[in-house]
A protein has these predicted regions:
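Positively charged n-region of N-terminal signal peptides that target proteins for export
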Residues: 1-4, 151
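Sec-dependent N-terminal signal peptides
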Residues: 4-14
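Boundary at the C-terminal end of the N-terminal hydrophobic targeting segment
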Residues: 16-20
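Subset of outer-membrane beta-barrel
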Residues: 21-387
Length: 387
């Protein structure tokens, strides 16, 4: 197998750590795809609540979670800088940087965009007769337009260019890979009465990365990009004029087909032919629909492909925030299970947020992962300059 594919598989192994005993886990069958960095939560606020964001209050980093939320933002514009030192339990030079921003057009629409850069640090290799150092990385650039159709409902559409250079060598048959994708999102936000309290209900949906397959060595080895469907709900409960709580939950499913499992009595050549017909030769759009019914374990395994996240946020005086959450993934699909905590501080001009991962498994490389977000409110900056 070519070194590039080995690099991709190595990255997946870093991300999908299985911590279950063999007696408890009889089948490990994760959904395989390229560009793993596209699935990493980029910002500290959502990461501090267990990786939720489809229906939370709109913020500057909504581009990743649900761009349809932007028309509901209070500020006219904003920009955020996000940084995550990734897998620090294993290596010290893998990092994710993410920049997002938006601008509201009038009262009912907004444009937004983001830049994601995932660095795998330096990799030393003795390919051929010479030693060399390569710096593999992945990146993406996207833009979206969101429109409020009513006072409570909005939609959004986005486009994305994805670029991946995971080469260990620079031979003629190797090349960086790229793909194009689109997003479709919806958001509902309304007030509901619970007793004598006027609470805020949010519902969201985001279908992300609907697009082409990505190929490093030609169409014969093309891989799926991580298309996914995210559904979320949130409820903000005011306590008094200065205090409020928000509880929220997300369900996320990869819209990528599952690699067929080799059957008893099936030869290796027969199995490879079936994998090619039922998986490798499947187009990206067909693969989205196929992903709902192709799990070898049937409906039970399809349910296991859904990742669940729950979170809560406490806000005091719109300035101080405390957050907590939990993220769950089935053992057979990757076993990413962890608690998260976080906090934030906000002023008129800027806000600073931090998120922290606490793994339920002792040897999970995601344990103790930190995320940092520095966001700027353009209305606040404008008011400051007028003084």
């Amino acid at each position: 197998m070519k070194k590039l594919i080995l690099m991709s598989l190595f990255l997946q192994c870093l991300y999908l750590q299985v911590q279950a005993d063999d007696d408890k886990l009889t089948t490990f069958n994760p959904v395989e795809h390229a560009v793993i960095s596209e699935t990493i939560a980029p910002d500290a606020r959502s990461a501090g609540m267990g990786d939720v964001g489809a229906a939370t209050d709109p913020d500057v980093n909504s581009q990743y979670w649900n761009p349809a939320k932007y028309p509901f933002c209070i500020s006219r514009a904003g920009i955020a800088l996000n940084y995550t030192p990734w897998l620090r339990q294993l290596v010290n030079d893998i990092d994710l940087a993410y920049v997002a921003g938006y601008y509201r057009i009038g009262d009912y629409s907004a444009i937004s965009g983001s830049l994601r850069y995932f660095s795998l640090g330096e990799v030393y290799t003795d390919y051929g007769n010479s030693d060399m150092t390569v710096k593999p990385y992945e990146m993406s650039i996207d833009a979206a337009y969101s429109l409020m159709l009513s006072e409570t409902f909005s939609i959004a559409a986005g486009i994305r260019w994805i670029y991946s250079d995971l080469r260990f060598d620079y031979s003629e048959d190797s090349k960086p890979a790229s793909a194009f994708a689109a997003d479709l999102a919806m958001y509902y936000n309304n007030y509901v009465m619970m007793g004598n309290r006027e609470c805020q209900l949010g519902l969201g949906m985001n279908i992300r990365n609907i697009g082409s397959k990505i190929s490093f060595y030609g169409d014969e080895e093309s891989q799926f990009i991580p298309a996914n469907l995210r559904l979320g709900a949130s409820l903000m409960i005011p306590v008094d004029e200065y205090n409020r709580f928000t509880i929220t939950a997300d369900a996320n499913k990869l819209l990528v087909p599952t690699v067929p499992r080799q059957q008893e009595g099936e030869s290796n050549s027969e199995y490879q032919d079936r994998v090619r017909k039922e998986y490798s030769d499947v187009g990206s759009i067909k693969g989205i629909f196929q992903s709902f019914s192709d799990a070898p374990g049937g409906f039970k395994e399809e349910l296991e492909e859904i990742q669940w996240s729950v979170g809560a946020e406490y806000v005091y005086h719109d300035q101080f925030s405390l957050r907590a959450g939990y993220h769950h993934q089935a053992e057979s699909k990757g076993n990413l299970k962890y608690f998260t905590v976080g906090g934030g501080f906000r002023m008129n001009v800027f806000s600073l947020d931090v998120g922290y991962v606490i793994s339920t498994a002792r040897s999970n490389p995601l344990d103790q992962t930190l995320r940092f977000t520095l966001a700027f409110d353009m209305d606040g900056i404008k008011d400051l300059l007028k003084r």
